[in-house]
Structures are given as C-alpha cells and as structure tokens.
Amino acid sequence: MSSAATLLARHAVASAVLTLVLAGCSSRLPAPDWALNAESASQRASTAYLEGRQRVQAMEWDKARAEVAATGRTDLAARVELMRCAAQVASLEWDDCPGYQALALDAAPAEAAYARYLQGKPRPEDVALLPELQRPVAQALLGAPASALAAVGAIKEPLPQLVAAGAALRAGAAQPQLLELGAETASAQGWRRAVMAWLLLQARAHDQAGEVDKAQAVRRRLSLLEKTASGGGASAGTSAGASVGTSAGK
C-alpha cells in the first residue's frame, strides 16, 4: 500500500475518497496524480473550512472536484462531497448536503451509510460500512444517543472526533460534556470556525441551565475569537452555532 493510502487511513473523512482506487495498489505502482491531488486539496479544504478561511476552502474544494471529475466517476465525486459535509458537521453547520444529494443515486452503499450517519440517522446495517473510528459512535446512537459520549471521547484523532461529536449532537446527544469536548477539540487545533460554533452552543446551554458564571466565561472566549477573526471566520462560526441553537435544550 502506498504512503498516500496510509495518510488517508489516518484521516477518517478523507480516507473514503481513494479507498477503491488505492485498495489494490502495490509499492511498485504509485497512486495516480489525480488521486493524490484530490486528496491533498480535500485535506486543505477541510482545514480551511474549519478555520473559517472562506475563499481558501472554496478554491480547494473546487480543485478537489475538478481532479475527481477528470475520472468521469460520479461515485468518487459523491465521496468528495461527503468530505465537505463532514467538515460542516464538525463545525455544526447542518444541512442536507445538497452537493452529495445531487450524486446520491451513484453513491456506493458505504457513502450512503456515511451520509445517514452525518445526519445523525444511522441504521443498524450501516455500522459495518462506516469508517472504523465512527462505528462505535454509530452503534451507540442506535441505542441511546446519550451513551455516545464515551465512544466519541475514545476517538483520539481530532477531525474524526469532531465529526463524531457533531453527528452525535445532531442525533440528540446534547450533553454538556459533549459540548465541552467539541469546543476543546476544535480549540486545540486552532479551528476558529468550529471553535466558535461549539462555544456558542455551549454558552446557550449554560444560559438555559442558569449557569451565569460559566456562560460569561465562554463568551469571553468568543469575544477573543471575534476580535481576532479574519476572512469571515467570525460570521461563519456565528451562523453555524445559530443553526443548531435549539439542540442544547433537547
């Protein structure tokens, strides 16, 4: 297996893009240029999105789409769109993933399963098809969403963990510990957009619980982020937090 495939395996979201292409590769056969270019552009796009760098993320997603489009394979194009959806879920920007939906008819079963998981609606038959790091979370969500916290906390890689936290929250696991985990995971990576979204939701949860001091502490962190925001990061985070504002009260 090539070093590119190893890198993708560490990145539970990005790994889906080239799984079929690289699954049968040998050390003597390098991955095709389009695959490597799509992988690197997708990773840069995901990072830029999480950081709130709007123009950069848009440019890099366009690059990734163009590289995959050169193959004429709509199933691979669907995977790229799911990667973008995963970054949105990690940042609490929830929609129906229209880019993926436009290609859903050609998506493989694993992609359909992942799309449902990102919406917080996994099915029992989906679990085995998901990225390995996400399977325990999906299994927990099938039982009681509140039990997913431990499974999310067991994920040690930042982006897969944040994606799992977003999926769990979307499924109804709006626990204070989950909100804190999401905020601190994003904070440790400097992902401004995601940090702001999770902190906004955390502040609202403290407000609803009557925890005035904790709410004020979170808002001081938000104030710092807003003062230093650039490239639209502040407004992006505010929008993301607003899109799930009612979840904290569930």
PLM regions with names:
Residues 41, 60, 76-77, 81, ...:
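TPR repeat positional signature
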Residues 64-95, 188-197, 226, 231:
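Short, charge-rich amphipathic alpha-helical segments embedded
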Residues 84-110, 121-130, 207-214:
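Alpha-helical linker/edge segments of TPR/alpha-solenoid repeat scaffolds
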